[in-house]
């Protein structure tokens, strides 16, 4: 087992990994940018080192600086979290050169699955269902028109190197095709440095269902059931739940077997997620995320498996401690991503200072966060404030518990997505489990109307509770005391 791990990330996921390290008796090392010098994760770590200016390109994406710190601190392994360098194959290559273990799959696997065309070809060879379309890049408009005609409109044009919903464009008629191709190629070149695009059949109302997989270095692979991620905006997830409301034992067997087959075929190691689109009884491979996912806590809650600790164990050379038969699902879990965004302004980012903060609690409630009262949310990174996770004996109890937890969650000073989540929990179609990836767009008018009502209700509640928030001088004193405590823990 490792004695010291460097966490090459920030915010809540950095703290999440550090907690796992602490439970395993492993020292943790934080790296941080100038903008994060007062961030909670830097104080939670046993050691912390500044690595550059606020821009990710000058800090969290600096492989050279991160490896310098790893060597200086004596870290034997690096956990990349999610985002930043988590799916950059070069990090693994550089770690290998320095004799440092990257907690994740091999660089060649990251590279193969990070390219949508390559991954689709591999999945076809593995016998995993894929969406009808091309399995090579398309640049000629005439060829694109022939392909679109053969598979039938609507089609979707995707960037081969894309991810996070960036570089995707649906096309409903041939007249739109050339313009859509040019636009997608331009976005792909700008965002990913690769203008290659491909074409697939566009599924208009699919569900987004993914399977968590875990594999060790001896070739043992299992799945830890499914997650439903259909509540999205601009192809980016907002709410996840486990298991999927439509999942049956038979469907889980089929989809889970396909996910395991995918991981086995590419020689996968560590934690990963195989994502599918589900439509009219059929499912199709979408992509594989070669890292821990933002939404991993809901899988932990329903299975009782600490995925991050298992990542560390597997990376240290241990075999999986359980088989597929050992994985049992208990109850239902929901996760709401609490972002510093204005949901009534098309989810525009809203960084700033948190002037009031009270997180929810009670049975079946978990908050993964990296913020605190008077914390300044920097504008340079993802807008996530926290992840609110609840568990219930069944889906209905989980929804009601989430409603209660959201009603307790108070964040002042910045606009957040809390009103959006409250509106979704009240939505009858959501409560019935009638989900698809265009749910938010379809019910937008009703959701917006409900949010406006909620914002007014929340404002009245906050005014009544203002006295519960401590004066800033007392907060500063408490923060200093917490800082002293955290530093004393490093000894």
From Swiss-Prot:
It catalyses: hydrogencarbonate + pyruvate + ATP = oxaloacetate + ADP + phosphate + H(+). The keyword Cell wall biogenesis/degradation does not apply. SMART domains: Biotin_carb_C (SM00878). PROSITE patterns: ATP_GRASP, BC, CPSASE_1, CPSASE_2. Residues 120-316 form the ATP-grasp domain. Optimum temperature is 60 degrees Celsius. Optimum pH is 8. Its EC number is 6.4.1.1. GO terms for biological process: gluconeogenesis. Residues 1-445 form the Biotin carboxylation domain. Pyruvate carboxylase catalyzes a 2-step reaction, involving the ATP-dependent carboxylation of the covalently attached biotin in the first step and the transfer of the carboxyl group to pyruvate in the second. This is Pyruvate carboxylase subunit A. It comes from Methanothermobacter thermautotrophicus (strain ATCC 29096 / DSM 1053 / JCM 10044 / NBRC 100330 / Delta H). The gene is pycA.
